[in-house]
């Protein structure tokens, strides 16, 4: 599915029939971290897979956000060095990355486009609420790209937003570090927002995130 500098993700399909369950297969994601060369890691340090599993629990339990269900995680070491780690999660059915779900604005106003525009605004508002709740709890993701927000169809045209890939995130208690992490998350999101959202959409998104009706002058520099 994907490969990074130290990780590789694979999509797996498991047969439930052998366990006496329904015949519908279970789709899983396996993410493997490898620590080699300049990326090698002391065995006494937490493994990235362990950190990611812990952060999913924090995001779910402390922030009230949707995350993939973690089935297992583990690590392997040789001597004083970690060699690899893994995390196994359930696939979010029918989910698409936010950068695929929200295309660039269109000027066509067909009946379907009006519906899609309403759905688009709902998804963007939900994303603002998600990031606001996460930051209010003191958690910063650090790698908050659009591709790490997955949109899954819900009931009555109310999609659900899932947050992924949080191996670098953490709870920050010190106010200065928390503010730095918050701005880093917002900056990461805005890299794609500049290309996919209009200026008015970005202003509405920021108002929703901040919980204000009007932006103060110091807020407007974030949407220049």
Indicate where each model-derived feature is located.
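Hydrophobic residue at the +6 position relative to the catalytic HRD Asp in the kinase catalytic loop
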Residues: 144-154
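C-lobe/activation-segment region of protein kinase-like
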Residues: 158-224
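Alpha-helix N-cap and loop-to-helix initiation/capping positions
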Residues: 44-47, 118-119, 130, 181
